[in-house]
Amino acid sequence: MTITPQHLIALLPLLIVGLTVVVVMLSIAWRRNHFLNATLSVIGLNAALVSLWFVGQAGAMDVTPLMRVDGFAMLYTGLVLLASLATCTFAYPWLEGYNDNQEEFYLLVLIASLGGILLANANHLAALFLGIELISLPLFGLIGYAFRQKRSLEASIKYTILSAAASSFLLFGMALVYAQSGNLSFEALGKSLGDGMLHEPLLLAGFGLMIVGLGFKLSLAPFHLWTPDVYQGAPAPVSTFLATASKIAIFGVVMRLFLYAPVGDSEAVRVVLGIIAFASIIFGNLMALSQTNIKRLLGYSSISHLGYLLVALIALQSGEMSMEAVGVYLAGYLFSSLGAFGVVSLMSSPFRGPDADSLYSYRGLFWHRPVLAAVMTVMMLSLAGIPMTLGFIGKFYVLAVGVQASLWWLVAAVVVGSAIGLYYYLRVAVSLYLHAPQQPGRDAPTNWQYSAGGIVVLISALLVLVLGVWPQPLISLVQLAMPLM
């Protein structure tokens, strides 16, 4: 096909981030300067965000058979770019105390965000696999960035080996799907499934293997075993990216796949996904109860959040409300996670060995950093789904979708999981207001609110509260971001 100027406009975010990768690479080769490379990365990501307006003006279109640029792709591209931007701003003060090479961090984040944008636009199983690999490979380096820390290196090796195994499952599943249907395009797969091919054993085996591969990337039970160790071992800014950008991008492409190729019409697939969702919600919340490490706690909580989202995915065939539910929930999850991990990043900056991830480090935080403690409280309440926060709106949507689709056992799991989650989120919030220990451990800088990371954390808290009280702007945005059918 011929690439026209319209196609280039549609690909602007991808092209801008790709160009930023090249510029940062050349800048590192020319002269190592931490501030310069961080600034170039942030400018590139901001330019990519601004370019989404021009993409919207160009309208929805297919750019090559691999990619479809529409409102849905723009929404998920925007969320990935916001997460990448936050990761870079949290990383800057953390890297200030890091004695080894600092600049490559931004390069790896940019390449991973490139993979996230590709996933948001993917309309083909080949693009899906390329995007997942492009987002996973830089994460191997990012997770082990503090390689002199034994735990960071261990987390990187663990993620690398398990990720390679998951990718092989995904690829083998795609091969079986192609062998049976002769197609890799989402829409062509949809036509094949419509012709009565959905119940073919080879096709179901292929989709089963793909669910294993994607379940690992989304850290769904029982493919979640890497999650707490990797969240704990990775530097705090990397855990931010891992919890937000990679999960959002992969879940977005899975939504598009299930929408165009209605795999969920198969009772066998629905039952398997239902069991995975149920296990993720209950197991994630139960395991988080006993955690004293805040990054491990957030790791287990992310398993349960992906379980809640899976309920909306299973209900996808029951109406457009499922699409809305996922969009609103992911936005709430993004801002809540950015705030929570942002506070951990600020407390851990500059780099001085292990992060401030023990719950004891946050005991009595209110008495010397009251605003930071208030931000952390808001994030915990939002993740718990308390009314007047954005997390409540997302959870309400998921429950409404579950009821609409008559998924009563999953609705019960969401209610029970939320009740369990309330305990451990409030445990973190309450510890912030207890008496401070005689010898406080790590602490955020006194002027944290004037740093770029501090501003991101404050904006996240503000959005969680404002959109929790008045969610209509977000709901309208998500309704506009419907995929081109």
Curated annotation (Swiss-Prot):
Report one GO cellular component: plasma membrane
Keywords tagged on the record: Cell inner membrane, Cell membrane, Membrane, NAD, Quinone, Translocase, Transmembrane, Transmembrane helix, Transport, Ubiquinone
Superkingdom of the source species: Bacteria
What is the membrane topology listed in the Swiss-Prot or TrEMBL record? Answer: Multi-pass membrane protein
Kindly list the residue ranges recorded as spanning the membrane: 8-28, 35-55, 71-91, 105-125, 127-147, 159-179, 203-223, 235-255, 271-291, 297-317, 326-346, 373-393, 408-430, 455-475
Catalytic activity entry: a quinone + NADH + 5 H(+)(in) = a quinol + NAD(+) + 4 H(+)(out)
E.C. designation(s):
7.1.1.-
- Return the broad EC class: translocase
Cellular compartments annotated: Cell inner membrane
One Gene Ontology biological process: ATP synthesis coupled electron transport
Q: Which GO terms describe its molecular function?
A: NADH dehydrogenase (ubiquinone) activity; NADH:ubiquinone reductase (non-electrogenic) activity; quinone binding
Q: What is its main location?
A: membrane
According to its UniProt entry, what is the function of this protein?
NDH-1 shuttles electrons from NADH, via FMN and iron-sulfur (Fe-S) centers, to quinones in the respiratory chain. The immediate electron acceptor for the enzyme in this species is believed to be ubiquinone. Couples the redox reaction to proton translocation (for every two electrons transferred, four hydrogen ions are translocated across the cytoplasmic membrane), and thus conserves the redox energy in a proton gradient.
Summary of subunit composition and partner proteins: NDH-1 is composed of 13 different subunits. Subunits NuoA, H, J, K, L, M, N constitute the membrane sector of the complex.
Family assignment from sequence similarity: Belongs to the complex I subunit 2 family.
Name-wise, this protein is NADH-quinone oxidoreductase subunit N
Lineage of this protein's species? Bacteria, Pseudomonadati, Pseudomonadota, Gammaproteobacteria, Enterobacterales
